[in-house]
Regions:
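Structural microenvironment flanking redox-active thiols in thiol-disulfide oxidoreductases
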Residues: 83-126, 135-141, 310, 377
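Bacterial N-terminal signal peptides that target proteins for export
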Residues: 2-16
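Non-globular targeting/processing and membrane-anchoring segments
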Residues: 17-53, 176-381
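Thiol/disulfide oxidoreductase modules built on the thioredoxin-like
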Residues: 125-130, 135-178, 347-352
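A short beta-strand-turn-helix
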Residues: 47-70, 93-96
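Sec-exported extracytoplasmic/periplasmic mature domains
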Residues: 50-53, 80, 84, 94-98, ...
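Short active-site neighborhood of thiol/selenol oxidoreductases, capturing the structured segment around
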Residues: 60-83, 89, 102-104
Length: 381
């Protein structure tokens, strides 16, 4: 998320301190019933399972973390919703790690290339994540918690019991208050720490329009597996659905509707990705869409190929500097982004919410589009 974050704050209300002290008593009550294991509030938190690798720490276990307050954050590094939560996670780590909070980022990958340890290590460095990260490549820990979303946060108390959970973005003040409360219950002195009073980022009301054409564009996937479902059908060409892993030549029909992708030229419909299926010289093959948003992001992976550039146009022209996302550069009057690793590229950042035509094209046959995501915030991806 771009921009400088400032966190106006004040001390936690005395009423919350009373609640925290009451929790201390509750947690130390004799003859307590041992809760069942699971991801629901009141359950004993499951042990980490099936972890392929640990980043930023040695192997951790929930048993070893008894006495600490643990925040389990399920994430994946190309997920825009996860990326939007990172400034808050980093702030909590900086403020509360010395007080007994342990954040564990459980990385459960959406795409195969996100399973590669070097990719996760690089993303942790790029985002400035210093807390422990567990690679949950087979979703074993995800399943143990019966988790169902990225991002998802589970707060576990000093006795290993799940006390709070939240799916998706937002509720940052509520989450921090719960962290504060559980640390007090664990015996930490955090009364000198100022809790943020900043409201959640403002989601623009235009994005909730009842008009489908104006409503925030849904997440759009390129791969056959996500397309070939009742909630999918992201590709607006019937031939695409005749079978996976096929190369077809597509013709753009020209009349574009919000929430769909349109193709021109030769494309391969892989299970996870839509890949350009030939080398070209004049950017004649493209992916087009009509979108409604303030920002557009594209998950692109070069595979094992050489780096390449993707040309971007909006409403039939290059992006202007005030419309360009952080990954856009300008070359000889063109707006492009250079793909040298598999990640989410921030392509469009408009000054105001609106509906526009977008086109992405590349001469490389390594150009593989996995997903588009869209934002409707005053700033950020």
């Amino acid at each position: 998320m771009s921009g400088t974050f400032r966190f106006p704050a004040l001390r936690l209300a005395p009423a919350l301190l009373v609640v925290a002290l009451a929790l201390v008593a509750a947690c130390t009550a004799p003859n307590a019933i041992v809760p069942k294991t699971g991801g629901n509030v009141g359950d004993q938190a499951p042990e980490f399972q099936g972890i392929a690798n640990w980043i930023n720490s040695e192997r951790l276990t929930m048993e070893e973390l008894r006495g600490k307050v643990v925040l389990i954050d399920f994430w994946t590094y190309t997920c825009v919703n996860c990326i939007r939560t990172m400034p808050y996670l980093k702030r909590w780590h900086d403020l509360y790690a010395d007080k007994g909070l342990v954040i564990v980022g459980v990385h459960s990958p959406e795409f195969e290339f996100e399973k590669l340890t070097p990719n996760v290590v690089d993303s942790a460095k790029t985002f400035g994540l210093a807390y422990p990260i567990a690679q949950d490549n087979d979703f074993a820990t995800w399943k143990a918690y019966s988790n169902r979303a990225w991002p998802a946060k589970y707060l576990v108390d000093k006795d290993g019991v799940v006390r709070y959970k939240h799916f998706g973005e937002g509720s940052y003040r509520e989450t921090e208050n719960k962290i504060w409360e559980l640390l007090i219950a664990a015996g930490a002195d955090v009364r000198d720490i100022l809790v943020s009073t900043v409201p959640d980022p403002k989601f623009l009301p235009e994005a909730r329009s009842r008009d489908r054409a104006l409503r925030l564009t849904r997440e759009l996937y390129g791969g056959y597996e996500r397309n070939n479902t009742r909630s999918g059908l992201y590709i607006a060409h019937g031939d695409y659905y005749a079978g996976a892993e096929r190369v077809l030549e597509y013709t753009d029909p020209g009349d574009h509707q919000n929430h769909s992708l349109y193709l021109q030229g030769n494309w391969f419909n892989g299970y996870e990705e839509l890949r350009h299926a030939r080398k070209t010289e004049s950017f004649e093959d493209y992916i087009a869409l009509r979108f409604s948003a303030t920002s557009v992001n594209a998950v692109v992976n070069p595979g094992e190929g050489q780096p390449f550039e993707v040309q971007v146009t909006i409403d039939g022209r290059p992006l202007r500097p005030d419309e360009a996302g952080p990954d856009i550069s300008f070359e000889q009057g063109r707006s492009v982004f250079k793909v040298d690793e598999g990640r989410m590229y921030e392509v469009v950042a408009l000054p105001a919410y609106g509906s526009h035509e977008l086109r992405l094209s590349s001469n490389s046959d390594d150009f593989a589009l996995f997903a588009f995501t869209f934002g409707a915030y005053e700033e950020g991806p």
